[in-house]
Structure formats: structure tokens, C-alpha cells
Amino acid sequence: MGETARLLGMLNLAGADTAINCWNDKYYWDFWRPWNAIQPTDPSWTPLFTAPYPEHPSGHLCLDSAHLGVLQMFFGNNVSFGVTSSRFGGETRFFNRFSDPLEEIVEARICAGLHFRTGDEQSVTLGGNVVRYMAEHYFQPVGNH
């Protein structure tokens, strides 16, 4: 039970610290979305989704990177798992490592018209940096009490 509590604490702290950093950066950079760049040259193009806040960095990828980084740190990277979508007919995607989904998420966010590649890749870095900092500074053993 103690290890489960530790894992949940790590996931939540990583998520909170990553979200704070991500949203700080979004409004620091205030970068435009792909549809702002594409539609003036191709008015028939439309994104799958729109968002009312800046593009860079990707909140989705910042958090995905942080959460997957915590799972990787806790269990090791080579863990097979599946993710089932309740939104798209219950389709399940299978992965062999915790690091594997990030590439697909980067591509999906670009194809949806939500992000540029640079924003997505830097989001993965941001989430990873938060997890590395957390691993070095938080949740250190305190001995037996």
C-alpha cells in the first residue's frame, strides 16, 4: 500500500508541477496555432479541434510526458500495456514501453492541427525535465521510523 501511495503522489506532483510550468510557458510565449498559419493560404483547410489558448507548449504532451516518465521511473521502461479509447469505439492501442506512446501523441496533435512539431517536442522535454527534477529532489528515502 505504501508503494501505491508513493506512485500516486509522484504522478500527482509531477502533473501539478508540469501543468504550472506548461501554462506559464504558454502565456510567456503566446505562440499562434497552426490554423492561424494555414487558413490564410488554404481557406478550405480546417483543424479537427480548436483551443482558446496559445499553442506552445502542448499541455497534453507536457502531462503525458510527465506521467509516462513517472511510470517509467517507478516500473522501468519495458512494460507492455494497452490504452482503450472509450470515445472511438473501444479501440485499444498496445505499446511495449512507457516511452512509446509519446511519438504517436506528437503526430496526432500535429495532424489534428493543434500544434507545430517544435511545440510538441519541447513539451515532451518539459515534462521529462520536471520528472527528472522530481526524482532528484522529492520522494527521497527518509529512513525507518
Feature locations, PLM:
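Hydrophobic alpha-helical bundle signature of multipass membrane enzymes
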Residues: 1-145
